[in-house]
């Protein structure tokens, strides 16, 4: 979002923020307006609940396509991945559905040429940084270093307090295919989420204090009780 706002100011454009979630996400939309977004749309309906990345990308692609019909889009910005599912699939899924060129793991926008309809992007890989030129409109999934989050100026703060985000539902303005939304449109279901159990602290034995033989016997006893010796010796 910070990168989108930065380039909006350079090119005298507009930024529209789209989010899919429960009604209380209205607060998040207002925060986006505080940062400089011009328009905010919350896509919210109980029928969208339980959506996996496939169903989510369908809904967002339909909404972004509708926005594009109202006011042509040059760049679509996504984060690299969500902090819950951590899949990094929704951005690429939207790009495929909208038939947009995509650059993932973007760390810098070098140039945007609206006359020649191209954008030049730096993207980070595990081994190096690539510089890629793609035609506009294009979709980017962005690393956090693509831009610094700016301090919101006072006029934007006041505007955000007064702003009423748009709420798009199953009732409109987009007509969604009920077979592709929510649980029905999701081939994957998360049954459980949790944090991994922390391993117990190990026991420390000082061989100098109890002697090598005692320390070795202690270690072998622990290994036998844990079944490690059976694995090493093949059950012998």
For every predicted segment, state its role.
Residues 1-236:
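N-terminal glycine-rich FAD/FM-binding segment characteristic of electron-transfer flavoproteins
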């Amino acid at each position: 979002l910070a990168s989108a706002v930065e380039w909006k100011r350079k090119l005298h454009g507009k930024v529209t923020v789209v989010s899919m979630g429960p009604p209380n996400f209205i607060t998040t939309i207002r925060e986006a307006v505080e940062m400089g977004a011009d328009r905010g749309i919350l896509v919210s309906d109980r029928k969208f609940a339980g959506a996996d990345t496939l169903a989510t990308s369908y809904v967002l692609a339909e909404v972004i396509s509708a926005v594009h019909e109202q006011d042509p889009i040059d760049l679509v910005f996504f984060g690299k991945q969500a902090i819950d599912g951590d899949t990094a699939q929704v951005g690429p899924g939207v790009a495929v559905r909208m038939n947009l060129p995509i650059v993932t793991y973007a760390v810098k926008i070098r140039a945007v040429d609206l006359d020649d309809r191209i954008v030049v992007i730096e993207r980070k890989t595990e081994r190096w940084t690539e510089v890629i030129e793609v035609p506009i409109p294009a979709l980017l999934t962005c690393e956090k270093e693509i831009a610094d989050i700016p301090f919101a100026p006072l006029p934007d703060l006041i505007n955000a307090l007064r702003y009423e985000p748009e709420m798009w539902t199953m009732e409109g303005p987009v007509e969604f295919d009920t077979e592709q939304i929510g649980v029905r449109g999701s081939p994957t279901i998360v049954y459980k989420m949790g944090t991994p159990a922390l391993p117990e602290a190990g026991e420390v034995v000082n061989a100098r204090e109890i002697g090598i033989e005692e320390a070795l016997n202690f270690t072998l006893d622990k290994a036998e009780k844990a079944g490690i010796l059976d694995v090493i010796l093949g059950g012998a």
